[in-house]
Amino acid sequence: MAKKSAVNRNEAVKALVKKFAEKRAALKAIANDETLPLEERFEARLKLAKLPRNSAAIRIRNRCEVTGRPRAYYRKLKMSRVALRELGSQGQIPGLVKSSW
């Protein structure tokens, strides 16, 4: 089980990303638009830099929904390999069968 503080911090980052997503996208569009004057684009870059660091989507860490574990994460199932193995052996995941040959 992951530390509650780490899981809560990640949730706070997700909230910030959601809050600033629209503003960040608009500033990025201005900064990357080559038809605009250089000063305007540079100003947009400065405004983008002033936004909170944790408002960038890259700061979100994929964590297991069951345990909060940050590593060995399967995106499709939103869980770690440890939780997958545990729930799979209990028969909690439909369609998952232990392989045998």
UniProtKB/Swiss-Prot annotation:
Query: Could you name the domain of life of the organism this protein comes from?
Result: Bacteria
Pfam families referenced in this protein's UniProt entry, alphabetically: Ribosomal_S14 (PF00253)
Name the Gene Ontology biological process terms. translation
Does the entry feature the keyword Ribonucleoprotein, yes or no?
yes
GO cellular component assignments: cytoplasm; small ribosomal subunit
| Intrachain disulfide bonds | none
Q: Which GO terms describe its molecular function?
A: rRNA binding; structural constituent of ribosome
Enumerate the UniProt keywords alphabetically: Ribonucleoprotein, Ribosomal protein, RNA-binding, rRNA-binding
Q: What does this protein do?
A: Binds 16S rRNA, required for the assembly of 30S particles and may also be responsible for determining the conformation of the 16S rRNA at the A site.
- Give the protein family: Belongs to the universal ribosomal protein uS14 family.
Which HAMAP family does the entry mention? Answer: Ribosomal_uS14_1
Q: How does it assemble?
A: Part of the 30S ribosomal subunit. Contacts proteins S3 and S10.
State what protein this is by name.
Small ribosomal subunit protein uS14
